[in-house]
Amino acid sequence: MREFNVSALLEGYRITDEVMAVSVQHAIKVMKSKYRNARNVYVFN
């Protein structure tokens, strides 16, 4: 497990959250499951 900085557009605001995940794709899925209405999700590192 690695820690990723994931950014998402949530209700018009850009938020950044640290997520523990196995891969970049998994980090995006975790972020989308955490915030159901998240859009434009991407990973910094």
Model features per residue range: what roles?
Residues 33-45:
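Short, mixed-charge low-complexity intrinsically disordered segments
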Residues 1-15:
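Short aromatic-glycine-(Arg/Gly/Cys) micro-motifs in beta-strand/loop hairpins
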Residues 17-19:
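Generic detection of short hydrophobic beta-strand segments and adjacent strand-loop junctions
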